[in-house]
Regions:
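Exported/periplasmic ABC-transporter solute-binding proteins
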Residues: 1-120
Length: 120
């Protein structure tokens, strides 16, 4: 299937069920956002980083989808994204990883709609 967002939604919101046979299934947040925005009767899902004024987020258990609510765990349908390297990063890879964890990189991550995390 190829969509981690869909896998998360199906596993957490559909109680491990699947979409109806006639559902318009798409393979990216961008395609889902476009499909929702173009159909006034559409119901779909996108990552929090893709929410904007073209679509309306849905509250779950009274909590709106936001960076803050996802970060503090009160919005329950979330997933983590990871950066992985083969061994210790070096050269440009290390520079990129260092940037992502720098104050500027954390600001960029947040401005892009994602939740910055420090190094563990």
């Amino acid at each position: 299937d190829g969509s981690g967002t869909r896998e998360t939604f199906e596993g957490r919101a559909l109680d491990k069920g699947t979409a109806a046979a006639g559902a318009n299934v798409v393979n990216s947040n961008g395609a889902m956002k476009t499909a929702i925005a173009q159909d006034p009767n559409a119901i779909g899902y996108v990552g929090i980083g893709h929410l904007d004024s073209s679509i309306q987020g849905v509250s779950i258990d009274g909590m709106v989808p936001s960076q803050e609510n996802a970060a503090n765990g009160t919005y329950k349908i979330t997933r983590l994204l990871y950066m992985n390297t083969k061994g210790e990063p070096a050269g440009l890879t290390k520079a990129f990883v260092d940037y992502i964890y720098s104050p500027d990189g954390q600001k960029f991550t947040s401005a892009s709609g994602y939740i910055p995390k420090g190094r563990d």
